[in-house]
Structures are given as structure tokens and as C-alpha cells.
């Protein structure tokens, strides 16, 4: 099956590792699906792929390498959001597209902006220049593993962005919440594509990142995860 074979498009193994360890094909006897979970708009499949390695490190007596890989199968919005083309004068995260219908007799490359779908709840008030709430605000849920002493500040950091959204005519556009308890919502899961999260990682890594899932047709951000490593604050202190 698809989940029991290697896909070069995912680059599970870097080329120099393949060369150094003489990594071959997938060993299907040692590869398997670990779990599969379905949600209203996505399915998450976790599987293990094992590869043969004729020149594995000495400590590796199995002569194999195993990797856990997660695939997300996501339903895209039926109502496509209008595209916004990149303006190179402004910094954006973008999706590169290729136009094969160009009259220049060659393919043309262009970029579309990755952005949230923020639509005014009161269009007439919005046109008058009044601040209005969006139909669907951006909501981030805190990772349950976030230390209690930091939660207040994580929320403040997320909601500080409201001042920026107000310049675009929206109030209360971005909200940070604690995750619901099992009693409040037994089906809540950070793997559910309907929920964006702020994930705390107990790691010595001095970094943070914000990967997102976007509709490749339009650039609409469907879900986002802010990943905050424990030692990121230490990195900030160095630059003060």
C-alpha cells in the first residue's frame, strides 16, 4: 500500500545518509501502520518504515533504519477563498504557482499569499471604517503540557497581535484559550485540523517556529501550530 512504501517526495532520508550507510529499499516485513485517527476534516495515519542499510554504524546490529512517519489527509474548503497575489514590497509567506497558459509560450512562476480567512461580521460597518469582529476569529489553544506559570504570558503574546489586526479593521480577531478538559470536550485533539495550537516543547533547543497548513489552491491558512521550545526565552535574553 501507499503507507508501506517510500515516497521520494517526502525526503525521509537525506541523500548523504543514503550514500554513507548504503540505505536500500523498504523492508515491508518490518514496516507497518501504527495508528489511524479520523476527524471531521482530516485523517491522521502514523506508520513505521524500515529500510535496509548494508553499511549501518557498528552499534546497529540489525543493519536497518526505522522511521516513524505521519501522513495527514485533509479535506479542503468547498468555498474557495479569493487569491491574493504577492506584492514583493511586503514580506509574506507564500505558495509558488506555475502558470502554463501564459501567452509567452513558456511557463510563468508567481506567488500567492498565505493568509487567514478574516471576513467582517458586519460588512456595512466595516466599509464605514468601524472596527468589527470577524465571522470566524483565529483561535489558538494552549498545549495542555504548557507550565501553568507561563500560560498567562503565552496568551498575552498571542493576543498582542490584535493591535495589528485592528489596523485592518478587525477587533478580537485572534484569541488564545486553554484547551477544553476531557469533561468539557472528550473528543478534543491537537491533531484535529479544526484547532490551531501553541505547543510547548520541553527541549534545550533555543528556537520557536510556526508551521501552518494552507489550501494550495488559494493560500488560505487552514490550521497553524506555534511551537515554543523551552530555551527560546534564553535566546531572547542574549539579544537584550
Model-derived segments and spans:
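Auxiliary tRNA-acceptor-end handling modules of aminoacyl-tRNA synthetases
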Residues: 1-146, 164, 168, 173, ...
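Soluble non-cytosolic domains of exported or imported proteins
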Residues: 144, 148-156
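Short secondary-structure boundary/capping segments
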Residues: 157-158, 192
Amino acid at each position: 500500500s501507499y503507507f508501506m512504501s517510500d515516497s521520494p517526495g517526502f525526503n525521509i532520508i537525506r541523500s548523504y545518509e543514503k550514500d554513507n550507510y548504503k540505505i536500500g529499499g523498504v523492508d515491508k516485513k518490518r514496516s507497518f501502520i501504527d495508528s489511524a485517527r479520523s476527524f471531521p476534516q482530516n485523517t491522521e495515519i502514523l506508520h513505521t518504515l524500515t529500510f535496509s542499510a548494508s553499511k549501518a554504524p557498528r552499534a546497529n546490529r540489525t543493519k536497518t533504519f526505522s522511521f516513524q512517519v505521519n501522513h495527514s489527509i485533509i479535506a479542503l474548503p468547498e468555498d474557495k477563498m479569493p487569491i491574493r497575489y504577492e506584492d514583493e514590497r511586503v514580506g509574506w509567506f507564500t505558495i509558488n504557482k506555475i502558470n502554463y497558459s501564459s501567452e509567452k509560450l513558456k511557463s510563468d512562476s508567481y506567488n500567492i499569499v498565505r493568509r487567514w480567512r478574516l471576513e467582517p461580521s458586519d460588512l456595512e460597518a466595516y466599509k464605514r471604517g468601524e472596527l468589527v469582529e470577524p465571522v470566524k476569529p483565529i483561535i489558538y489553544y494552549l498545549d495542555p503540557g504548557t507550565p501553568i506559570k507561563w500560560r498567562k504570558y503565552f496568551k498575552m503574546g498571542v493576543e498582542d497581535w490584535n493591535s495589528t489586526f485592528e489596523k485592518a479593521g478587525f477587533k478580537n480577531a485572534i484569541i488564545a484559550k486553554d484547551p477544553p478538559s476531557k469533561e468539557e470536550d472528550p473528543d478534543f485533539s491537537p491533531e484535529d485540523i479544526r484547532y490551531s495550537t501553541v505547543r510547548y516543547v520541553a527541549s534545550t533547543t533555543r528556537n520557536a517556529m510556526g508551521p501552518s497548513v494552507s489550501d494550495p489552491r488559494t493560500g488560505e491558512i487552514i490550521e497553524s501550530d506555534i511551537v515554543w521550545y523551552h530555551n527560546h526565552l534564553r535566546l531572547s535574553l542574549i539579544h537584550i
